[in-house]
Amino acid sequence: MATRARGLSLLRGRLGRGPARAPGVAERAWRGFGSSSRRHEAVIISGTEMAKQIRRELQQGVESWLALGNRRPHLSIILVGDNPASHTYVRNKIRAASAVGICSELIVKPKNVSQEELLDITDQLNMDPRVSGILVQLPLPDHVDERTICNGIAPEKDVDGFHIINIGRLCLDQHSLIPATASAVWEIIKRAGIETFGKNVVVAGRSKNVGMPIAMLLHTDGEHERPGGDATVTIAHRHTPREQLKAHTQLAEIIIVAAGIPGLITADMVREGATVIDVGINYVQDPVTGKTKLVGDVDFEAVKKKASFITPVPGGVGPMTVAMLLKNTLLAAKNITY
């Protein structure tokens, strides 16, 4: 009975306080990656600075891998069409890969390329021993089924983490190549020392590549093969009435927004001291300059006055997504995920 009572006592303590951790972990993380001009404003988490640290770690990892006599990690990127944003994203990925010692190649196809030709390309890359990771830049033209193409990539080379097997393993809390944006959000939370155990989390957005994987990472068991966040997660989407969304976000300690709606989350929807992670990517016209600018889904200037942590757009989740893609490429080269 004494053993059982002690076990129950420990469980109550864990449920009440979350797992113990060394004092000052969060504070050190704030100083390393965040800034706040005034004490009553949120710490702005710099994804740019955090990504720099991860790239340094990856560079060391690549050098250690090569020192053991292994082949240099190689990333093959397939780009379809002439979408300017896609070309910019791909250039950034190639530049970042080169900086950490990962070699890459770009395969460009016109927007009228057939689905069959794309599948032939992925088949060839799957069988190529020099290729560690394969990425198909999305979106694809309407006549090409994205799910079919993503599933055409070998799971062990699927550095975007979109293959049905990788998504399935993620849902089962098993090791897999995790979608890069979801992995970026999870890494930001961990490196900033933000507690998730038993916390209320709202994920606004249910896309299969971003919102759903984020929710899976945050709600799953922290003691499983692939540890999760042990949070209580509510998923909202475009059909969630605004007042209902507001009711959920006002209760949430962590709000993650990946809906693609500028200004979706306003200050009145956020509780004091919440963590707000903005995954949104929206191009809008600046009313003052008339120029196009990049914004997220959060009213940043207003919300930062209530939150404890907030990520900016640009300079938040975006740089971290590229860093986690490179991390997946190194994992794929080592072939240790499965």
From Swiss-Prot:
Keyword Ribonucleoprotein: no
PROSITE patterns (alphabetical): THF_DHG_CYH_2 (PS00767)
Gene Ontology CC, one term: mitochondrion
EC assignment: 1.5.1.15, 1.5.1.5, 3.5.4.9
Cofactor annotation: Mg(2+)
GO biological process, one term: 10-formyltetrahydrofolate metabolic process
Localization terms from the record: Mitochondrion inner membrane
Gene Ontology MF annotations: methenyltetrahydrofolate cyclohydrolase activity; methylenetetrahydrofolate dehydrogenase (NAD+) activity; methylenetetrahydrofolate dehydrogenase (NADP+) activity
Pfam families noted in UniProt: THF_DHG_CYH, THF_DHG_CYH_C
CDD domains named among the record's database cross-references: NAD_bind_m-THF_DH_Cyclohyd
SUPFAM superfamilies tied to this protein: Aminoacid dehydrogenase-like, N-terminal domain (SSF53223), NAD(P)-binding Rossmann-fold domains (SSF51735)
Tissue specificity note: Widely expressed.
HAMAP family, alphabetized: THF_DHG_CYH (MF_01576)
Family statement drawn from the similarity comment of this UniProt entry: Belongs to the tetrahydrofolate dehydrogenase/cyclohydrolase family.
Protein name in the entry: Bifunctional methylenetetrahydrofolate dehydrogenase/cyclohydrolase 2, mitochondrial
Species annotation: Rattus norvegicus
Lineage, top ranks: Eukaryota, Metazoa, Chordata, Craniata, Vertebrata
